[in-house]
Amino acid sequence: KVTSSDVAEKAGVSQATVSMVLNHKYNVSFSRETVEKVESAARELGYQLPGHKNKKENKKEKMIVVFCPTITSPYYVMLLQGIEAVANERGYGVFICNTQRDARLEEKYLRMIRAMAPQGIIYACNPHPDYISQVEEMARSIPLVIISNKEKISTVDAINQDNTEVGRLMARHLLDLGHRDVAFITPPLTRRQWQRSKRVDGFVREFEKAGLSGHVIIRAADESVDRRNPKTDSEYSMGYALTRSLLEDGSRFTAIAGQNDMMAIGAVDALQDARLRVPKDVSVIGCDNIFYSGIRRVSL
């Protein structure tokens, strides 16, 4: 019978380390290399922790883990509701890991998942670049999919959205309405959120194609925004603040494009507070088609 000392010898670590790694003691930190060596040795030797039944004998509840960057955005709430509805229909429970775009929190959840043994993992956003290899390793043993424009270096399955085309369609709509000088407001254009940049690029290129190079003002929020804990009104507030800054510095535009609907709603409020009429004075376009974008505006 294989024992923990056999695993320790094969992995080149102490028996205590084997015990803590395989029992997922989260108050003790081990390097990723050590964890992988121990888990690999245990798998190769067929070692099972005392008291743990064989997976075939152990009837666990079926569960899917979903990594989500925020639960304050209506877009992600709609996404989670859709995932949960389909999962429940098929007898699966859903465990949501709200990372709040915090790399340390994401790493903690990745460690916890090893003990959960879920039937599948869904990333509703790109994994943090530091953990791409860890996610790829996990995908070899657990079905895993990314709902986003995955990093080009990643080999994990993904449902990709053509954000360049999304940006192009937004620009084309404004051009068809006769707009020639416009502004595009967006959350931070960081490496991790490079799909945001794709949407901006598609938008700008369509204007350039129409012979209007230099007619698009890009106004992005500061990168520090993504490092703060998101609040319910984070994207709305960004849209409001960026629009105010455009108005205050005298920028010339007849339309504003928001990276998403919540930013566009913030833009509308900022314009109306400045006594500008929407769409008579300035047009506003968003993206996502969330429920709130169709509500007639009223102050409750």
Predicted segments with their positions:
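Short beta-strand elements in bilobed, periplasmic/extracellular small-molecule ligand-binding domains
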Residues: 87-98, 204-236
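Short beta-strand segments enriched in small/hydrophobic residues
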Residues: 15-20, 56-72, 181-189
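Central regulatory/effector-binding core of bacterial HTH transcription factors
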Residues: 85-129
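Hydrophobic alpha-helical segments within soluble ligand-binding/sensing domains
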Residues: 157-185, 201, 205, 236-246, ...
